[in-house]
């Protein structure tokens, strides 16, 4: 799969996910996840930050870590097409690659169950 297929970019689709998508909150990590099934064959991801999150270096590093963890866990989403938005709020973040990867695995499985129940 091409790298550009992983990113969610359309403003209309992003607004639709925020309005109609399901929400999972992680208050201990200052993280929210919105997800919704899509009409495509593959899943897409967007990592965004709250307004108070300063420092472009830190933001971009976290964004890269999320995208890489998602890319590696993509095989768990075989047959399920999701649009996923992560909203990272400012706080005492100690997000390492391994914590994000384990979080991603749990979230993907949780989304899979949520989509399965709604069918």
Curated annotation (Swiss-Prot):
Q: Name one GO biological process term.
A: tRNA 5'-leader removal
In the Enzyme Commission scheme, what number(s) does this protein have?
Answer: 3.1.26.5
Species for this entry: Borreliella burgdorferi (strain ATCC 35210 / DSM 4680 / CIP 102532 / B31)
One Pfam family cited in the UniProt record for this chain: Ribonuclease_P
- State the name under which the record lists this protein: Ribonuclease P protein component
Q: Which reaction does it catalyse?
A: Endonucleolytic cleavage of RNA, removing 5'-extranucleotides from tRNA precursor
What are the protein's UniProt keywords?
Answer: Endonuclease, Hydrolase, Nuclease, RNA-binding, tRNA processing
Which SUPFAM superfamilies does the record associate with it? Ribosomal protein S5 domain 2-like (SSF54211)
Q: Name one GO cellular component term.
A: ribonuclease P complex
- What is the stated purpose of this protein? RNaseP catalyzes the removal of the 5'-leader sequence from pre-tRNA to produce the mature 5'-terminus. It can also cleave other RNA substrates such as 4.5S RNA. The protein component plays an auxiliary but essential role in vivo by binding to the 5'-leader sequence and broadening the substrate specificity of the ribozyme.
Task: Relate the assembly described in the record.
Answer: Consists of a catalytic RNA component (M1 or rnpB) and a protein subunit.
Q: GO molecular function terms here?
A: 3'-tRNA processing endoribonuclease activity; ribonuclease P activity; tRNA binding
Q: Establish whether keyword Amino-acid biosynthesis is in the entry.
A: no
* PANTHER family, alphabetized: RIBONUCLEASE P PROTEIN COMPONENT
């Amino acid at each position: 799969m091409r790298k550009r297929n992983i990113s969610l970019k359309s403003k209309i689709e992003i607004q639709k996910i925020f309005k109609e998508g399901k929400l999972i909150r992680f208050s201990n990590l200052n993280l929210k996840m919105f997800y919704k099934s899509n009409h495509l064959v593959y899943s897409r991801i967007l990592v965004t930050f709250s307004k108070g999150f300063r420092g472009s270096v830190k933001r971009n590093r976290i964004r890269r870590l999320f995208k890489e963890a998602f890319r590696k866990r993509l095989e768990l989403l075989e047959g399920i097409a999701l649009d996923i938005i992560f909203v990272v709020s400012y706080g005492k973040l100690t997000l390492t690659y391994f914590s994000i990867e384990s979080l991603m695995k749990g979230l993907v499985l949780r989304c899979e169950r949520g989509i399965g129940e709604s069918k």
